[in-house]
Amino acid sequence: MKISILGTNGFLSTAIAKYANEVGWTLNMYGLDAPIDCEYSNFYKVNLMDAELDCSGLMDSDLIIYAIGAGIQANLKEGLNLIYNLNVTAPVTICNKLKELNYQGRFVTFG
């Protein structure tokens, strides 16, 4: 199985990536920084606040997990624009783009 995780070093993305490592799945990671606590096949640096994600690289994934988020940790003071864009706008935009491209796998979002 080939999975792509959007979000690299958060609690959720790390836990899912470690599971993917255990079961031997091909793992592509997308985020601001390379994953620290898991192995991965490919890392793609993306900043969803700067540019829209090119979804064409996701099309051969059996499963895409959106685990990017903002405003979750009380100790971080993140602006409302960042919180709304990462938790609402970006996942909806990606979902719509995947639909346009006739993506046949599963898209799961926690945003």
Protein language model features and the residues they cover:
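Structural motif
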Residues: 2, 62-63, 106
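N-terminal Rossmann NAD(P)H-binding glycine-rich loop of SDR-like oxidoreductase domains
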Residues: 3-23
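SDR active-site strand-loop-helix element
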Residues: 6, 30, 67-68, 107-111
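Short, charged/polar "capping" segments at the starts of alpha-helices
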Residues: 12, 34-39
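Conserved glycine-rich Rossmann-like NAD(P)H-binding loop of the short-chain dehydrogenase/reductase
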Residues: 25-34
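Rossmann-fold cofactor-recognition segment
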Residues: 37-51
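NAD(P)H-binding glycine-rich loop region in Rossmannoid oxidoreductase-like domains
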Residues: 48-86
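Conserved Rossmann-fold NAD(P)-dependent oxidoreductase catalytic core, especially the SDR/UDP-sugar
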Residues: 92-111
